[in-house]
Amino acid sequence: MSGGKYVDSEGHLYTVPIREQGNIYKPNNKTMADEMNEKQVYDAHTKEIDLVNRDPKHLNDDVVKIDFEDVIAEPEGTHSFDGIWKASFTTFTVTKYWFYRLLSAVFGIPMALIWGIYFAIVSFLHIWVVVPYIKSFLIEIQCISRVYSIYIHTFCDPLFEAFGKVFSNIRINTQKEI
C-alpha cells in the first residue's frame, strides 16, 4: 500500500499502519483511491432513472413502436369520411395510451417483481453453478484429453500412416472412349 513512512521510538523505519490509510477493503479516502488509481464505483441500485428517455438502449425501437398509421391504412380510392378517420385516429391513440397505462399500473409492479426474481435466479445459477461447472469440466477434460492424445499417437497415428502409405501408390487412369 502506498503511504508515508515513520520512525518508531527505537529508530526503526516503518510504513504507515494500514488502518491509518483507510479501509483496506474499500478505500473511502479519495486521496488514497487516487493514489491507487482506482476508479470510483457507483452503486447500480441507487442511480437516478431517466423519466424522459425510458429506453436509452433502444430495446423496443422496431418491436413495440406502433402508431395508428402502422396498423390502419386506407389505400387510394377507398377513403372514409374525414371525421371518421380523425375520430378513429384519436380513439386508437387514446385507447392505446390509456390502456397501456392501466395495464402497466395493474401488472407493472408484479411483473417487475417476477422478472427481478427470474433474473436474480439466472444470475445466481450462472455465477454459482454454470461457471464453476464449466471450470471443473475443463479441468477434468484435460486429464481425459491427455490420455486420448496418447491413445491417438500410439495406435491411430501409425495405423493411418500405414493406410496412407498403402493407398499412396494407387493410381487411377481414366480414358474416354468414343
Swiss-Prot record:
<dbReference type="GO" id="GO:0044877">
    <property type="term" value="F:protein-containing complex binding"/>
</dbReference>
<dbReference type="GO" id="GO:0042383">
    <property type="term" value="C:sarcolemma"/>
</dbReference>
<dbReference type="GO" id="GO:0030193">
    <property type="term" value="P:regulation of blood coagulation"/>
</dbReference>
<dbReference type="GO" id="GO:0060070">
    <property type="term" value="P:canonical Wnt signaling pathway"/>
</dbReference>
<dbReference type="GO" id="GO:0042802">
    <property type="term" value="F:identical protein binding"/>
</dbReference>
<feature type="region of interest" description="Required for homooligomerization">
    <location>
        <begin position="2"/>
        <end position="94"/>
    </location>
</feature>
<dbReference type="GO" id="GO:0031398">
    <property type="term" value="P:positive regulation of protein ubiquitination"/>
</dbReference>
<dbReference type="GO" id="GO:0043627">
    <property type="term" value="P:response to estrogen"/>
</dbReference>
<dbReference type="GO" id="GO:0071455">
    <property type="term" value="P:cellular response to hyperoxia"/>
</dbReference>
<dbReference type="GO" id="GO:0048147">
    <property type="term" value="P:negative regulation of fibroblast proliferation"/>
</dbReference>
<dbReference type="GO" id="GO:0060056">
    <property type="term" value="P:mammary gland involution"/>
</dbReference>
<dbReference type="GO" id="GO:0005938">
    <property type="term" value="C:cell cortex"/>
</dbReference>
<dbReference type="InterPro" id="IPR018361">
    <property type="entry name" value="Caveolin_CS"/>
</dbReference>
<dbReference type="GO" id="GO:0042310">
    <property type="term" value="P:vasoconstriction"/>
</dbReference>
<dbReference type="GO" id="GO:0044325">
    <property type="term" value="F:transmembrane transporter binding"/>
</dbReference>
<dbReference type="GO" id="GO:0010524">
    <property type="term" value="P:positive regulation of calcium ion transport into cytosol"/>
</dbReference>
<keyword id="KW-0472">Membrane</keyword>
<dbReference type="GO" id="GO:0070320">
    <property type="term" value="F:inward rectifier potassium channel inhibitor activity"/>
</dbReference>
<dbReference type="GO" id="GO:0071711">
    <property type="term" value="P:basement membrane organization"/>
</dbReference>
<dbReference type="GO" id="GO:0002931">
    <property type="term" value="P:response to ischemia"/>
</dbReference>
<dbReference type="GO" id="GO:0001666">
    <property type="term" value="P:response to hypoxia"/>
</dbReference>
<dbReference type="GO" id="GO:0038016">
    <property type="term" value="P:insulin receptor internalization"/>
</dbReference>
<feature type="modified residue" description="Phosphoserine">
    <location>
        <position position="2"/>
    </location>
</feature>
<dbReference type="GO" id="GO:0060546">
    <property type="term" value="P:negative regulation of necroptotic process"/>
</dbReference>
<dbReference type="GO" id="GO:0001937">
    <property type="term" value="P:negative regulation of endothelial cell proliferation"/>
</dbReference>
<keyword id="KW-0597">Phosphoprotein</keyword>
<feature type="lipid moiety-binding region" description="S-palmitoyl cysteine">
    <location>
        <position position="143"/>
    </location>
</feature>
<dbReference type="GO" id="GO:0046716">
    <property type="term" value="P:muscle cell cellular homeostasis"/>
</dbReference>
<dbReference type="GO" id="GO:0001935">
    <property type="term" value="P:endothelial cell proliferation"/>
</dbReference>
<keyword id="KW-0007">Acetylation</keyword>
<dbReference type="GO" id="GO:0034141">
    <property type="term" value="P:positive regulation of toll-like receptor 3 signaling pathway"/>
</dbReference>
<feature type="cross-link" description="Glycyl lysine isopeptide (Lys-Gly) (interchain with G-Cter in ubiquitin)">
    <location>
        <position position="47"/>
    </location>
</feature>
<feature type="region of interest" description="Interacts with SPRY1, SPRY2, and SPRY4">
    <location>
        <begin position="149"/>
        <end position="160"/>
    </location>
</feature>
<dbReference type="GO" id="GO:0030857">
    <property type="term" value="P:negative regulation of epithelial cell differentiation"/>
</dbReference>
<feature type="modified residue" description="N6-acetyllysine; alternate">
    <location>
        <position position="5"/>
    </location>
</feature>
<dbReference type="GO" id="GO:0019915">
    <property type="term" value="P:lipid storage"/>
</dbReference>
<protein>
    <recommendedName>
        <fullName>Caveolin-1</fullName>
    </recommendedName>
</protein>
<dbReference type="GO" id="GO:0051899">
    <property type="term" value="P:membrane depolarization"/>
</dbReference>
<dbReference type="GO" id="GO:0015031">
    <property type="term" value="P:protein transport"/>
</dbReference>
<dbReference type="GO" id="GO:2001238">
    <property type="term" value="P:positive regulation of extrinsic apoptotic signaling pathway"/>
</dbReference>
<dbReference type="GO" id="GO:0002095">
    <property type="term" value="C:caveolar macromolecular signaling complex"/>
</dbReference>
<dbReference type="GO" id="GO:0045907">
    <property type="term" value="P:positive regulation of vasoconstriction"/>
</dbReference>
